[in-house]
Amino acid sequence: MRQKLEELLTAIQSPDRSLAIVAQAHLDDLTKPKGSLGCLEEIALSYVVATGRIKPVLERKKICCFAGDHGVAAEGVSAFPPEVTPQMVYNMLNGGAAINVLARHAGAELSVVDVGVNHDFPDLPGLLRRKVRYGSRNMSLEPAMSENETIHALMVGAELARDAALAGFHLLGTGEMGIANTTPAAALFAVLLDIPVETITGRGTGIDDARLNHKIAVIRKAIKVNEASLSTPLGTLAALGGYEIAAIAGFVLGASVCRVPVVIDGFISTAGAVAAMFLSPAVADYLFFSHLSGEQGHRIVMEKLARKPILDLDLRLGEGTGGALAMRIIEASVNVYNEMQTFSSAGVSGKTEE
């Protein structure tokens, strides 16, 4: 299993940054004052560099929502019971969740991926059954996943990204569903980005002060219990992560091999992206962070990564909802880049020199 991961990581290459010079010159020649479209120009330039195409294409979009259960839910860190995970998966498959609405209006295909739900799903349209295990272990007592299970989940995500690239999708998005998954996400941020546990840990699905303090204590205990496993990114992901978080990390890795940009959703998806960045720093150039999550600590994570999320709407749902919204902004940015006239082609006079 480890050899498969090494081969995947070796295949990831940094994009050609020289394309940024050509793309910036094109943006500056569009019929507008330089920089007047603000972040749209930055997004378009990043998309050109990531895809390696000076004439970028963005027509087909796909979101994969990865689902998994967490053993640490037994510690009472969430306001909702674990059985909500499969219930919400069924809701998504029936078209009733927020991500269904937002993905549809973004023109994005949606797949729900079972990588670790503690439930047996029948064959259903829109569901990809890729179960690694029936939920992770309780990370406050032992490692959440074994190394082989972690690599298995990573490869599930990577293979789905490659399949999407081969099917002709131009932009991918991440989503997740898993009761208690803000707990492993916060633990991963605390260790990988060296953020104090009390700073990074938030209220998740809306827990009160007493349960928040308990959640902080559980995360501290998990870090202490698994201390011997935290010397490497893979060991940290295995000890403190979850199957859907590992699959998101793999999704990022696989997409980066194929030079397909990925829109990262919120707090939990960012944990998967950060794990991928620690496994292969080159993936950073293929990522768009969709929004600043309402979950406590996400702003600090973005500052640590020196990244600016596209949207700030106080979203804290997950599922890929922020990613679906941001896809429309990215598409608008690419359309501006491709479809606006240039000063030279339109016969419009440029800015006069004073």
Swiss-Prot record:
GO BP term (any one): cobalamin biosynthetic process
EC number: 2.4.2.21
Catalytic activity: 5,6-dimethylbenzimidazole + nicotinate beta-D-ribonucleotide = alpha-ribazole 5'-phosphate + nicotinate + H(+)
Pathway(s) where this gene product acts: Nucleoside biosynthesis; alpha-ribazole biosynthesis; alpha-ribazole from 5,6-dimethylbenzimidazole: step 1/2
Molecular function terms from GO: nicotinate-nucleotide-dimethylbenzimidazole phosphoribosyltransferase activity
Keyword tags: Cobalamin biosynthesis, Glycosyltransferase, Transferase
Tree of life domain: Bacteria
Family: Belongs to the CobT family.
Protein purpose: Catalyzes the synthesis of alpha-ribazole-5'-phosphate from nicotinate mononucleotide (NAMN) and 5,6-dimethylbenzimidazole (DMB).
Protein name in the entry: Nicotinate-nucleotide--dimethylbenzimidazole phosphoribosyltransferase
Organism, scientific name: Chlorobium phaeobacteroides (strain DSM 266 / SMG 266 / 2430)
